[in-house]
């Protein structure tokens, strides 16, 4: 399986949600790509949740369908200019984590089926809308990992935080 195929991306999306929700998987260790993604996206997600708390508090994620609707609206705005880059792709994962936490905050118990549904539509979006760009830019292992693994944490953090703040500020027009 190549790193631009749906199954690979879906695995990254599922691994990220397990990381965000602190779900331990006995006997399985995330790939290097998954670990780098978790580090970068969770840093961005944490900062966004802290700095944009008031904005995020204004929207309710009460179902997977609501999460999908919000996700599609935000991604449509995020990519309407046709520009794809690694920072924007990281924001997709950070937003996946935010939506999932909002949804599970409304539920009595964690429902892994809901998480699987969210990781599915996130992976579907990434594969369909950024897959070709990812392939042209070295793929996950030779593009993404090389870009984010060797950079200073602050430079990466500032680059990606700017993108996700821009995206989430767009939520204000919907909620």
Swiss-Prot record:
Q: Which GO terms describe its biological process?
A: extrinsic apoptotic signaling pathway in absence of ligand; intrinsic apoptotic signaling pathway in response to DNA damage; mitochondrial fusion; negative regulation of apoptotic process; positive regulation of apoptotic process; release of cytochrome c from mitochondria
A molecular function (GO) term: channel activity
Q: Which Gene3D superfamilies match?
A: Blc2-like
Q: Where does the source fall among the domains of life?
A: Eukaryota
The positions making up the signal sequence are: none
Give compartment(s). Cytoplasm
Keywords on this record? Apoptosis, Cytoplasm
Instruction: List the GO cellular component terms.
Output: cytoplasm; mitochondrial outer membrane
Cited SUPFAM superfamilies: Bcl-2 inhibitors of programmed cell death
Q: Name one Pfam family in it.
A: Bcl-2
Q: What does this protein do?
A: Retards apoptosis induced by IL-3 deprivation. May function in the response of hemopoietic cells to external signals and in maintaining endothelial survival during infection. Can inhibit apoptosis induced by serum starvation in the mammary epithelial cell line HC11.
Q: Which family does it belong to?
A: Belongs to the Bcl-2 family.
Designated name of the protein = Bcl-2-related protein A1
Q: Which organism is it from?
A: Bos taurus
> From which lineage does this chain's organism come?
Eukaryota, Metazoa, Chordata, Craniata, Vertebrata
């Amino acid at each position: 399986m190549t790193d631009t195929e749906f199954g690979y991306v879906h695995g990254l999306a599922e691994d990220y949600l397990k990381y965000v929700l602190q779900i331990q998987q006995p006997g399985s260790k995330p790939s290097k790509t998954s670990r780098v993604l978790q580090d970068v996206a969770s840093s961005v997600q944490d900062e966004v949740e802290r700095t944009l708390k008031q904005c995020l508090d204004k929207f309710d994620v009460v179902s997977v369908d609501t999460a999908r609707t919000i996700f599609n609206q935000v991604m449509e705005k995020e990519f309407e200019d046709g520009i794809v880059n690694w920072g924007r792709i990281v924001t997709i994962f950070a937003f996946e984590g935010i939506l999932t936490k909002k949804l599970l905050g409304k539920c009595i118990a964690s429902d892994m089926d809901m998480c699987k549904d969210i990781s599915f539509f996130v992976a579907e979006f990434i594969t369909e809308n950024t897959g070709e760009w990812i392939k042209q830019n070295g793929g996950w292992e030779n593009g993404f990992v090389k870009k984010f693994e060797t950079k200073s944490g602050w430079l990466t953090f500032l680059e990606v935080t700017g993108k996700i703040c821009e995206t989430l500020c767009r939520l204000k027009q919907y909620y």
